[in-house]
A protein has these predicted regions:
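Membrane-interface segments of envelope glycosyltransferases acting on lipid-linked substrates or membrane lipids
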Residues: 1-168
Length: 168
């Protein structure tokens, strides 16, 4: 017996940007291809267009960088992951990636990220904060430029066990 693929995507806001529309498109693609599609976000303009009979929407303050809210989001995500038998957790931004990372450790689910842009890293603390995007089993780089940026600036967070792929 095969297990149905259930994917949870987590993005701060579902607006009209590239990461957001990609998230929206993949959510509907998954549902149209017999996969469970779940989307956690704090809000955004595209929410009204989500086919709620096909994509389960989870409203959480995943846009917040507040450590207490990141921890809160972690525990709520853990509940959803177990309740809906989520197989893959896909984070598309740094703040929600921390919640997803901790939830993946607790639930032992596959953690994936998409690295969409270059991040400021003037301090070691900021670089550590950004490094969450490379702590996944698979990190997707949104372009060859981002792929090069990751290799040049975050090489110490890359390992042979974790994969880095480029899409464009």
């Amino acid at each position: 017996m095969t297990t149905k693929l259930n994917v949870l995507q987590v993005i701060p806001k579902l607006g009209y940007g590239g990461a957001e529309t990609g998230c929206y498109d993949i959510a509907h693609f998954l549902s149209e291809n017999d996969c469970g599609s779940f989307l956690a976000t704090s809000g955004g303009e595209l929410i009204k267009f989500i086919k709620k009979d096909k994509v389960r929407l989870i409203r959480l303050p995943v846009h917040s960088k507040n450590p207490i809210l990141i921890l809160f989001n972690t525990f709520i995500l853990v509940i959803y992951i177990f309740l809906f038998k989520i197989n893959i957790i896909h984070a598309r931004s740094r703040a929600p990636a921390w919640s997803c990372y901790f939830a993946s450790l607790i639930t032992r689910r596959v953690f994936v990220t998409t690295f969409h842009g270059t991040y400021n890293f003037k301090s070691n603390i900021k670089k550590f904060y950004n490094s969450i995007m490379l702590r996944a089993k698979l990190t997707i780089a949104g372009s060859n430029f981002i792929f090069s940026h990751i290799n040049e600036n975050y090489w110490e967070y890359l390992s042979k066990e974790k994969k880095l792929r480029v899409i464009f």
